[in-house]
Structures are given as C-alpha cells and as structure tokens.
C-alpha cells in the first residue's frame, strides 16, 4: 500500500510518500518527501493552480492508494482562509484522481505518533524518525509533518 500524507499550506504544502507491504505487515518506509512551494509574488488564484498542478504530478509519479490530509482547525491568523482554500484544492485534486482520502486533526496526529495530543513538534518529528528508521529529521518541517499525517493513516487503518 502506498500512502500520501499532505500538510496543507498556501506558501508550502508538505508531502510524504510511504510504502507498506500489507501482507508482511512491515513498518512503513519513506519513498519520498518534500514540499510543493508557490511563488509569493503571484495572486492566490495562481498559487492554487500551482498547488493543483504540482499535486497532479506527484499523484502520477507515486500513484498512492490512500491520501491522508491534515484537517485544519481554526485559529486567528491572517492566512487562515488562504490555507483552508489550499486544503480545498488538495481535496478536490485527490477526488478527481479518485484517491480515497482520510483527514486527521493535529491533536490526533500528535496522539498517534507521540502518545500525547499535546506533544510538541520535536516529539512528533522524533517519532517520525523512529517509525521510519531515519537517521535525521526530514526537512523541511512541512515534509516531516506530512510524513506524520501519512503514518497516522497507517496506524489508524
């Protein structure tokens, strides 16, 4: 099974691709991780088009069986609406490719990986390293967060 984890954002969308041999019940292995970045000098609409285009390329390249997206919870921020809109672009693109999608709020991701819904970013990143048997934390943070979302999907299956 191939799982694509996504951490939504307007400037940067983190992604992480995991591979799991379900018959052997192996631990997930990281196939790829990184970010989709958009040009801050462009309008929001153009940036959404960039996100959709780059996600389509990732979907064609990695052919995930399942996508997991961080469910945004609201807080007061000047970019809240833009992030929610970018998340909508991700969900729409996944639907167009008919990829089953699950969503998890940050607290559930932290609980699944670090054992506490109030874990800090470092604790979650350490758990990602441990679960994927990595020697160092994935960079940038958005990619590490996306791997955490993907791992949560594997743990919650």
UniProtKB/Swiss-Prot annotation:
Cross-referenced Pfam families: RuvC
Record-listed Mg(2+) 1 binding positions: 7, 142
InterPro entries on file: RNaseH-like_sf (IPR012337), RNaseH_sf (IPR036397), X-over_junc_endoDNase_RuvC (IPR002176)
Active site location: 7, 70, 142
Domain of life per record: Bacteria
Uppermost EC category: hydrolase
Coiled-coil ranges (or none): none
Necessary cofactors: Mg(2+)
Cellular localization per UniProt: Cytoplasm
E.C. designation(s): 3.1.21.10
GO cellular component: cytoplasm; Holliday junction resolvase complex
UniProt-listed CDD domains: RuvC
Co-factor note (free text): Binds 2 Mg(2+) ion per subunit.
Binding site for Mg(2+) 2: 70
GO BP, sorted A to Z: DNA recombination; DNA repair
Gene Ontology MF term list: crossover junction DNA endonuclease activity; DNA binding; magnesium ion binding
Catalytic activity: Endonucleolytic cleavage at a junction such as a reciprocal single-stranded crossover between two homologous DNA duplexes (Holliday junction)
The entry's keywords: Cytoplasm, DNA damage, DNA recombination, DNA repair, DNA-binding, Endonuclease, Hydrolase, Magnesium, Metal-binding, Nuclease
Family in the record: Belongs to the RuvC family.
HAMAP family on file: RuvC (MF_00034)
PANTHER family: CROSSOVER JUNCTION ENDODEOXYRIBONUCLEASE RUVC
Biological role stated in the UniProt entry: The RuvA-RuvB-RuvC complex processes Holliday junction (HJ) DNA during genetic recombination and DNA repair. Endonuclease that resolves HJ intermediates. Cleaves cruciform DNA by making single-stranded nicks across the HJ at symmetrical positions within the homologous arms, yielding a 5'-phosphate and a 3'-hydroxyl group; requires a central core of homology in the junction. The consensus cleavage sequence is 5'-(A/T)TT(C/G)-3'. Cleavage occurs on the 3'-side of the TT dinucleotide at the point of strand exchange.
The protein's assembly and partners: Homodimer which binds Holliday junction (HJ) DNA. The HJ becomes 2-fold symmetrical on binding to RuvC with unstacked arms; it has a different conformation from HJ DNA in complex with RuvA. In the full resolvosome a probable DNA-RuvA(4)-RuvB(12)-RuvC(2) complex forms which resolves the HJ.
Protein name: Crossover junction endodeoxyribonuclease RuvC
Organism: Synechococcus sp. (strain RCC307)
